[in-house]
């Protein structure tokens, strides 16, 4: 009976996600269907910018929650693994025809290979074949980005996973900062382009379908990051709900008891760390696609703290909490509070404080209020289906109480 209920819940969740993805496609193409639609529905509007960034950040936040929330390992190396993913993706997908221009300061690239050209030689570079080549190169590069991040996580995991609590956090944060410095090293310029940005690789706008005249007939630049994020988060959910996930939670709750139960602590910690880093690497590649470039100086410790803040706001140990918190965090910081940065006059009176930067002051106060009133985060350690089921149960109990009173 319980298994049937679980299957129904899982089926309903997949149907809901499919419906949400279709809705996003329709929403992004609303101005094509109805040319007179409000400006907010234009594909270049702030609404879709927020959705793209939220999709990328939600994946990274969930990957961090897998490690911090479900396994109890406090790591601050997320920005470093994102950097590895972003650069792996960019280096593999910059076409050979653009490498001389991108690496002009170094006389060209040392990497004489491009996935786009490799697949283009098989499927073609224009028309339907060109689209297939581009899609395959992106998918393979995303997987490679995750694998490179996971490999480096395995390398540093051997020594650092012996550490606990703050010491592990400091070690992983140091690793991320070292990586950022190395990737800006001029000696590696022919590979990483030094302190300069890598560009000219496929981005989310590359998935927009155009007519022969060059006009866009179907926008998919928001659908694709959401699709990638949904698929990756679904894999993390499956892992958390598996026997491995239960082992992670046992380690988080009590390492001594978990080891007494026969759980191999070192192996499961490494699995969690490597898996989290894999998805952080994929998230880094998606971030590069979002900003249309890869540059090491962007992946600072501040980015890691942002992701950590999102995890705390959503609830440590809640995947749906991380997704909801990401959407709220990005929408507030990038969109809803933008009006606070503009100088405002009421007649001849200038409204005080409203100027560039005031938005972040108010945003910080909002975060403090949320943390004060939601000590365990918005969702705590619960998931959205549990919360909705609880609401339904309470509503049903209230109705039953009213009927009994009558």
Where are the language model's segments positioned?
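Transmembrane alpha-helices and adjacent helix-loop boundaries
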Residues: 1-406
């Amino acid at each position: 009976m319980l298994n049937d209920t679980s299957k129904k819940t899982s089926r309903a969740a997949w149907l809901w996600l499919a419906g949400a993805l279709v809705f996003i496609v329709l929403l992004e193409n609303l101005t094509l269907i109805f040319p007179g639609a409000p400006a907010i529905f234009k594909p270049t509007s702030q609404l879709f910018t927020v959705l793209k960034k939220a999709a990328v950040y939600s994946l990274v936040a969930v990957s961090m929650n897998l490690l911090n929330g479900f396994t109890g390992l406090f790591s601050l190396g997320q920005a470093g693994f994102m950097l590895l993913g972003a650069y792996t993706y960019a280096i593999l997908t910059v076409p050979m025809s653009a490498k001389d221009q991108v690496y002009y300061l170094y006389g060209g690239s040392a990497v004489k290979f491009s996935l786009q050209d490799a697949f283009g030689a098989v499927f073609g570079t224009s028309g339907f074949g060109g689209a297939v080549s581009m899609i395959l190169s992106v998918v393979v590069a995303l997987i490679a980005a995750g694998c490179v991040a996971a490999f480096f996580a395995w390398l540093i995991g051997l020594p650092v996973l012996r550490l606990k609590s703050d010491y592990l956090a400091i070690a992983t944060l140091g690793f991320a900062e070292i990586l950022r410095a190395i990737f800006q090293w001029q000696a590696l310029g022919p590979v990483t382009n030094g302190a300069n940005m890598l560009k000219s690789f496929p981005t989310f706008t590359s998935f927009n379908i155009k007519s022969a005249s060059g006009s866009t007939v179907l926008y998919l630049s928001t659908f694709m990051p959401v699709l990638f994020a949904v698929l990756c988060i679904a894999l993390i959910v499956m892992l958390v709900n598996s026997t491995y996930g239960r082992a992670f939670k046992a380690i988080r709750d009590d390492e001594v008891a978990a080891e007494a139960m026969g759980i191999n602590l070192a192996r499961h910690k490494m699995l969690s760390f490597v898996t989290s880093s894999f998805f952080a690497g994929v998230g880094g590649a998606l971030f590069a696609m979002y900003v249309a470039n890869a540059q090491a100086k962007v992946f600072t410790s501040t980015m890691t703290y942002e992701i950590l803040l999102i995890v705390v706001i959503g609830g440590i140990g809640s995947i749906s909490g991380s997704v909801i918190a990401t959407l709220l965090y990005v929408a507030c910081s990038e969109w809803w509070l933008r009006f606070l940065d503009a100088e405002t006059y009421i007649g001849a009176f200038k409204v005080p404080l409203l100027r560039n930067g005031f938005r972040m002051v108010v945003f910080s106060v909002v975060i403090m209020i949320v943390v004060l009133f939601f000590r365990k985060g918005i969702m705590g350690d619960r998931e959205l289906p549990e919360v909705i089921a609880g609401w339904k149960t309470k509503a049903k109990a209230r109705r039953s109480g009213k009927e009994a009173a009558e």
